[in-house]
Regions:
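Glycine/proline-enriched, intrinsically flexible loops and inter-domain linkers
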Residues: 1-232
C-alpha cells in the first residue's frame, strides 16, 4: 500500500518496514478493537508493501534517526485520513504530527560539568466526529511524559520562564482539536541546540468541515533580543 511513497530523503526522516508495520497495526487495532490483546493472528491479514529506497524503506547509508519522532506520526495521520472515508465515526483528524524533540547541551557555568537536556514536547490531539481532541498529549506512536519545571531547573542550568497550554492553537469546529503547549526556556552560558520538529509550514488538518490547527513555531532569542525562527 506504500509502494508509491517518495524516494528516501537526504535528511534523517526515513524509516524502515518495522516502523511502518507498527503504525498499520496500531491504527487498525485502535479502529477495530482497542481492547484486543496484541497477537500474531490479528496482524496476519495485513500485507504491508513498501519500496526499498523509499522514505519508508531506507537502505544504507540513508539516515533514519527521526523516523519515530516525525515520520511515524505522519504515517498514522495518513492512514486515519484515508480511513475517514470508510469509518468516519472511528477516526480522528490530524494530530500535532511530531514529538518535537528538543536537545540543549553545554557546560554548566556553575559546576563546569557537561550536561545534555533532551525532552519531547506534546501537542494537541485531533478532534473526532463527536468528541474534542485532548490537550497537550503525546499522540499515537509515542508515550513520553513532560518533565516538571522543578525537575528541569534542579538538574540543568536552565530557567523555565513560561510553560502552559497555548490558547487558540487547536483546529476549530463543532468539535475542536486539542491545544498545544508553549514553553520558554532561558539558557545560562553557551549552548548547542538541536530540534527535531515539523508542522511549521503545513498545519494539522481538520476533518468533516473542521478547520486546520495553527502551525508550530520554535524561536531562539539571542542576548541582544534578535529573534531567529528555527525551520522544521
Amino acid at each position: 500500500m506504500f509502494s508509491a511513497s517518495d524516494d528516501a530523503a537526504l535528511g534523517p526522516i526515513n524509516c524502515r518496514w518495522p516502523s511502518v508495520a507498527a503504525c498499520v497495526y496500531y491504527v487498525f487495532k485502535a479502529i477495530l478493537d482497542p481492547e484486543l490483546p496484541p497477537n500474531a493472528g490479528a496482524y496476519s491479514p495485513f500485507e504491508i508493501i513498501v519500496r526499498d529506497g523509499s522514505v519508508l524503506s531506507a537502505i544504507y547509508p540513508m539516515a533514519v534517526c527521526n523516523a519515530n519522532i516525525i515520520t511515524t506520526q505522519r504515517i498514522t495521520d495518513v492512514l486515519l485520513g484515508a480511513l475517514s472515508h470508510a469509518v468516519p465515526e472511528r477516526v480522528q483528524a490530524a494530530c500535532s504530527g511530531t514529538m518535537n524533540l528538543l536537545n540543549i547541551g553545554g557546560t554548566n557555568p556553575k559546576s563546569g560539568v557537561l550536561y545534555n537536556y533532551i525532552e519531547t514536547y506534546a501537542g494537541g490531539q485531533g478532534a473526532m466526529h463527536d468528541l474534542d481532541g485532548m490537550d497537550a498529549i503525546q499522540n499515537h506512536m509515542t508515550n513520553t511524559r513532560n518533565a516538571p519545571v522543578e525537575a528541569i531547573e534542579a538538574a540543568y542550568p536552565l530557567i523555565v520562564e513560561k510553560y502552559g497550554l497555548l490558547p487558540d492553537s487547536e483546529g476549530p469546529g463543532e468539535y475542536r482539536g486539542g491545544v498545544g503547549i508553549t514553553r520558554v526556556l532561558r539558557t545560562q552560558g553557551d549552548v548547542q541546540l538541536t530540534l527535531s520538529s515539523d508542522r511549521e509550514t503545513v498545519p494539522p488538518w481538520g476533518l468533516f468541515g473542521g478547520d486546520d490547527a495553527r502551525p508550530s513555531k520554535c524561536e531562539v532569542i539571542d542576548p541582544d533580543g534578535v529573534i531567529e525562527r528555527l525551520p522544521s
